[in-house]
Structure formats: C-alpha cells, structure tokens
Amino acid sequence: MAAPSAAVAAAATERLAGLATPPGALGRLGDLAVWIAATQGVCPPRELTDVGLVIFAGDHGVARHGVSAYPPEITAAMVRTFLSGRAGVSALAHAHGVRVRVLDLGVDDDLDGVPDDVRRHKVRRSSGAIHLEDALTADETGQALEVGATVAREEIAAGAQLLLSGDMGIGNTTPAAALVAAGLGLPATEVTGRGTGIDDAALLHKEQVVQQALDRAGARTDDPVDTLTALGSADLAASTGYLAEAARQGVPVLLDGLMAVACALTADRIEPGAAAWYAAGHRSTEPAQSLALAKLGLEPVLDLGLRLGEGSGAVAAVPVLRSAVALLRDVALLSEILPGA
C-alpha cells in the first residue's frame, strides 16, 4: 500500500510555516491542509471541487431481534427518500456541493420503481442474524467487496477528488459494533451503543446479541474477510471494499460515523496502511467509533453529538477541509509581504 507523499507533506508543512499567520494559528486546519496536499501529491493542494458520497444500503437480520428502536421497513423507505433528495444528508449535500449516490446491496425489499442503477449491485435481501448464523456466504462477501471496489473506481474515473461513505440500514450499528470488537479484540460491553436511541433494557439485550455473535464467530475473526462473512452484511462489506479500493487508488476518504469507521478498520486489516488515506469527519456518540478511530490514529474534524448516519457527519465536515485547502493555497507567504523576513 503506497502512502500519501512524504515529500509533498514536507513541502506543505514548510509552506504552512511560511504563511503570513502566527505559528500554529491555523490549528487543525493546517494539519488537514498538509494531509490533503500529501494525498494529492501536490503543494499547494488543488481545490476540492468534486466530492462524492456513496450510500450503501442494506438490511440486517438482527434488526428483527430487538436491537433497534425502528422496524426494518424504514430502510427501503429511506432509500426512496434519498432519491427524492429529502433526507438529512441530502440537505447537507445540497448545501455543500457534494454528489450523492445510493446503492441497494441488501435491502429486504425489491424496491419496485427504483432506478436500475440503484438496484443493479444487489447481493441479497437482508443478511443473516449474526448471533445465530453467518451474515453472508463467502461468495456473497467476495461479491460485495468487489462491488464496493468497482464503485470506488467508477467514482474516481468520474473525477472524484474526495470520497465519502454513507450508510442506511436499520440495525446496522449491531454488526458494525461486532466488526470493531472483532478487529480490536474487545468484548461487546465496550463497543455496544444505543444506535437509534434504545433504552437501557434494549441496550443490555443488544450487548448480549453482539457477544453471542462474537462467541459464535470465534477464531474466524482473525481473518478480516471471514469476519465480514460471519459478522458483517452486504452493505458493510461493499463499504469496506470501497474504502480499501480508494486507498489503493490513492484517493482520500472522509469517514462518517460508526459504520464507515468500522468498515475503515476492516479495510485497514485487509490492506495494511489504508488508514493513511482516511480522515475522520466527525465523532459519533457510538463508543465503538471512538475506539476504532483511536486504533486508526484519526482525530475527528467535528464533534457535534451527531448520530444520524447516512454520511451526514462527513458531509458536514467537507467545508472544513475546503477551508483548510483554501488557507494553504491562497494565504500570502510572509516572505511575499515582508521581503527578506
């Protein structure tokens, strides 16, 4: 796995130090600007004019086992809402000039009337309830990983300079928490959160479901791909493939909440070093996300208490990255305004 350019990072750091601003005055914006420059391989960095969000949608067998505050039927309804441009992330994307693409990987609905380009990558309807059975077959996992990689290549070929990964699937925080637990070797009690806002009794039950899933998977979690088969889903596997391929192609990714970060952790297990191409858009309220970010060495750009999902936190952070680029590109050098300084 090639890393972002160290030489360009050094040049960007030198330029940052030479700006007509007090040392350290730009804080995290300076760090983000250096990272973007290194991923682009050029200093000053190019403006981020083409940013693409792909939302991977799918249902989860565990959603019918008391782990979510909402019924699985919401997933299909939200796919249609994305397409109408009326979802939360749709409003943010419109405000910030981010392209949105939604794909059905495993929605438990035929989505009649939905455009073929949304449905053509479908791997299966829903996934196995991970505390009782594997989420996917090995072949389905491979298919979903390749779909994600293909979609990343398509987005990059279309001109995307920055990629975002969004999610939609009732119950998806349960397999995502299991993926993080598997990747970090942690028990369910440390990674399980309230998702869409479940009460204390449901949280305890959700912890038990996640731990039962981990116990059932056993040593298979040593293999990241087999982990996806046992504990993931079609949408999470596709997101993992998308994130891994973005890193292979040398295109930066701004991560969203738990689902994106769980997939990023898994992608980094599959392709060690992939995390160098990722930045964390925001800190979610889910404990597993913070644990995975710490493992990946990523500090969130925003901390707003968001738990919407959909890619919303990453989209909200896009203007911050654009601001970072603008500062490194457009602020005068001290040597330009005070020759000889």
What name fits each language-model region?
Residues M1-A341:
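N-terminal loops that bind phosphate or other acidic moieties
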